[in-house]
């Protein structure tokens, strides 16, 4: 039986338009002010040093780092330093009520159903763990973090790497064959399946004709008790 479900956020629990049309512009507009106002103190100075390490430029100036961050945003680069900085900026937006975290209406009822079945539910996203927690604690449905057993970001590895899913399995203590991964991205699901996980692909739009994973349009159609392990 499935003992743990790990779900992606963007395009899976949450409309991709919320991320690209609300969260990303909000962070972009405030990024330079956030950096310059805090560059001499934590956490900003630590994040800037992390970014210097990422780009192998230990002497990079703040101006160069800001330029790099904007470039990474343009490229949708999965930079841990960028994701952490965005998370700090989004915190202000969530706390001030500038927006709430979007969740598809089928998500929370399914999370409650799975939780009632004693299935542990985890989040795995390229967004930082603090940013993930903000979305689920300030969601359209209120604070639903009580339904979640934990959060993972790219510190366990990239989402298209097989080793990332093995790392998550080890951290949760759940054997790979009893793990179920939900995502809208075929390549992520391919990596999870190669690691030994079960997979379901969320299709919120047109079907993925190149995918070999089971495809559903709603969390309502996912019944982990029926998935053989």
From Swiss-Prot:
* One BP annotation, GO: L-methionine salvage from methylthioadenosine
Q: Which residues form a coiled coil?
A: none
Q: Does the keyword Magnesium apply?
A: yes
Q: What is its EC number?
A: 3.1.3.77
Q: List the pathway annotation.
A: Amino-acid biosynthesis; L-methionine biosynthesis via salvage pathway; L-methionine from S-methyl-5-thio-alpha-D-ribose 1-phosphate: step 3/6; Amino-acid biosynthesis; L-methionine biosynthesis via salvage pathway; L-methionine from S-methyl-5-thio-alpha-D-ribose 1-phosphate: step 4/6
Which ranges are annotated Polar residues under compositional bias? 208-218
Region of interest (Disordered), ranges: 208-229
Which Pfam family is one of those matched by this entry? Hydrolase
Lineage: superkingdom? Bacteria
> What reaction is this protein's catalytic activity?
5-methylsulfanyl-2,3-dioxopentyl phosphate + H2O = 1,2-dihydroxy-5-(methylsulfanyl)pent-1-en-3-one + phosphate
Cofactors that this protein relies on? Mg(2+)
HAMAP family reported for this sequence: Salvage_MtnC
> NCBIfam families under this entry?
enolase-ppase
What is the annotated role of this protein in its UniProt record?
Answer: Bifunctional enzyme that catalyzes the enolization of 2,3-diketo-5-methylthiopentyl-1-phosphate (DK-MTP-1-P) into the intermediate 2-hydroxy-3-keto-5-methylthiopentenyl-1-phosphate (HK-MTPenyl-1-P), which is then dephosphorylated to form the acireductone 1,2-dihydroxy-3-keto-5-methylthiopentene (DHK-MTPene).
* Protein name from the UniProt record: Enolase-phosphatase E1
- Its source organism is Cronobacter sakazakii
């Amino acid at each position: 039986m499935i003992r743990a479900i790990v779900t992606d956020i963007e395009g899976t629990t949450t409309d991709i338009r919320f991320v690209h049309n609300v969260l990303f512009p909000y962070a972009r507009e405030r990024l330079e002010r956030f950096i310059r106002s805090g560059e001499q103190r934590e956490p900003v100075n630590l994040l800037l040093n992390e970014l210097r390490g990422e780009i192998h430029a230990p002497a990079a100036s703040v101006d160069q780092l800001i330029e790099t961050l904007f470039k990474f945003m343009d490229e949708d680069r999965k930079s841990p330093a960028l994701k952490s900085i965005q998370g700090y900026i989004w915190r202000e937006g969530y706390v001030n009520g500038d927006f709430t975290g979007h969740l598809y209406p089928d998500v929370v009822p399914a999370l409650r159903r799975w939780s009632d079945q004693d299935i542990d539910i985890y989040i795995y996203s390229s967004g930082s763990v603090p940013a993930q927690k903000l979305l689920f604690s300030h969601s359209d449905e209120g604070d639903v973090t009580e339904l979640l057993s934990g959060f993972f970001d790219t510190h366990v590895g990239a989402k298209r790497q097989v080793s990332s899913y093995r790392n998550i399995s080890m951290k949760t203590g759940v054997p790979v064959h009893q793990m179920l991964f939900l995502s809208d991205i075929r390549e992520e699901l391919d990596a999870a399946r190669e690691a030994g996980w079960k997979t379901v692909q969320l299709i919120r739009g047109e079907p993925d004709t190149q995918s070999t994973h089971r495809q559903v349009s709603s969390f309502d159609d996912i019944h982990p008790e029926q998935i053989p392990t």
